[in-house]
Every structure is written in C-alpha cells, then in structure tokens.
Amino acid sequence: MATKIDKEACRTAYNLVRDDSSAVIWVTFKYDGSTIVPGEQGAEYQDFIQQCTDDVRLFAFVRFTTGDAMSKRSKFALITWIGENVSGLQRAKTGTDKTLVKEVVQNFAKEFVISDRKELEEDFIKNELKKAGGANYDAQTE
C-alpha cells in the first residue's frame, strides 16, 4: 500500500517547532500503518534521542540555536532516523517516503540520514549546522 501523509496535522507540528516563542524544539513524524503522522514532541533534545531506537524509522524536525557571539539564530535540521533492526524493505521505503515529509517540512538548513546513535549527538549536529551556515566570526570574540 502506498504511503500517505496527514499534511494538516504534520504542518501544525512543523509550525510549532518553527515558532521561536514555542518551547517545543523538536517533533517526530512516524508511521501509523501506511500514513505518516506527527509523533512525539518536546523541549529537550535528549528526549528526542530517546525516540530513536533500533527498531523504528522516523523523521524529525529539530530547532537548534546556533551562531556566534555576535548573532544567535535558530537553525533547523531534518533528521531521518533508521534503526539498525529496521528491515531492508522498510529502509528502502523510508527514502521515497521522505519526499512526502518534505512537502510539509520545507525550510531547514541541513538534512541528516542517521542510523548510528553517535551521530545524533547534539554537538555533532550543531557543528554540521554551523558549517552549513557560512561565515564564522568566532575569531572576533575576546
């Protein structure tokens, strides 16, 4: 059966993360049968990491505060998590299903496809977002 997405519910969750006045910094999009729906959400990145277990595949939209001493700003990441115990067929479908998620999640600085929990470390993701952000003025700090 072809995968579908609940666009309205997913868009609501996506906008919650994009809203700087919201405490929610991440949301997952998971499978409910053959439909992608919003999953968990939260204000702590470590809580998101707990969702990424070996037997699940999910998509996540995460807000990080990056920048240097001169300018702090929000950067967004689209993370595709595929656990080690996910079957080959489901792994393959995840790649094509991501196009549905991208119909909703359209603004992000960098995209990650991760199956190793070490790559979920906050410092690793922030460093990659910093590289994607262009100019770095950290050398000007005293």
Curated annotation (Swiss-Prot):
Gene3D superfamilies xrefs: Severin
Residues with PTM N6-acetyllysine: K102, K126
Keyword DNA repair: no
GO molecular function list: actin filament binding
Residue ranges of domain ADF-H in the record: 2-130
Keywords carried by this UniProt record: Acetylation, Actin-binding, Chaperone, Cytoplasm, Cytoskeleton, Nucleus
GO CC aspect terms: cortical actin cytoskeleton; nucleus; site of polarized growth
Protein name as annotated: Coactosin-like protein
Species, as recorded: Bos taurus
